[in-house]
Amino acid sequence: MIPFPSRRAVGAALVAGLLAVMPMQAAAQRDAPVIAAASDLQFAITEVAQAFTAETGQAVRLSFGSTGNFARQIREGAPFGVFMAADEAFIADLHADGFTRDAGDLYALGRIVIMVPEGSALAPDADLDALERMLTAGEIARFAIANPEHAPYGMRAREALISRGLWDDLQPVMVLGENVSQAAQFALSGNAAGGIIAYSLALAPQVAARGTYALIPEDWHAPLRQRMALLKGAGPTAEAFYAYMQTPEARAIMAGYGFDLPGDG
């Protein structure tokens, strides 16, 4: 892997609030439960939380990061109310070890895309043919994904690239984001030809304005079955938010960010 140069002004809209707890209602910040949400949910769950607060008057705080890192923090005693994972396997492991109330609920199925910044010589195509051509010609300087060691969207990106036969050849130019939102920042920075990110991020207006994308075939990787669960210490507001996630209003918001929803179709 190669180091990625930082650019202060790049991707400010992408990472606003990333990994930081964001209050939905300042007056209730002290008592509001923390929702630990996978980074692919950055825009979708922010919108859901705003709708939840507007409808119920109850506030939550949002913390975005990689699913694997959150799972580790929960095991170390992090006081989250709800854990919204990008891969249900993490919920299953936590439940087996007694950290969640129950096995939780599937709330969404995610997709991955190849996305390139405006002006990139790389054209996004679902079969990654342009990526292969430019890589063979030595014309890819950097290509971004989330870290597959702990970020499910990085895991699925790796699986897709292995399926396509490009994983090994990309290693010299690969840059890893700590989570998929940071990978999107890297991919759209102008210092990279592009990257593989969450479809839900690519659809957000703040991101869509910065580049173009193509959906990667679902059969190139394992499904992104996204599951949530209440943690053992969750209180009434966390319970209310968890229930709200399953309402038509919340589901409509999630669908608007490209998620397939359990029970549809």
Regions found by a protein language model. Give the residues of each.
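Intrinsically disordered, low-complexity segments
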Residues: 1-4, 37
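N-terminal secretory signal peptides and thylakoid transit peptides that target proteins
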Residues: 3-13
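Bacterial N-terminal signal peptides
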Residues: 11-22
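Sec/Tat signal peptide C-region and signal peptidase I cleavage site
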Residues: 24-28
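Exported/periplasmic ABC-transporter solute-binding proteins
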Residues: 29-64, 68, 72-78, 85-88, ...
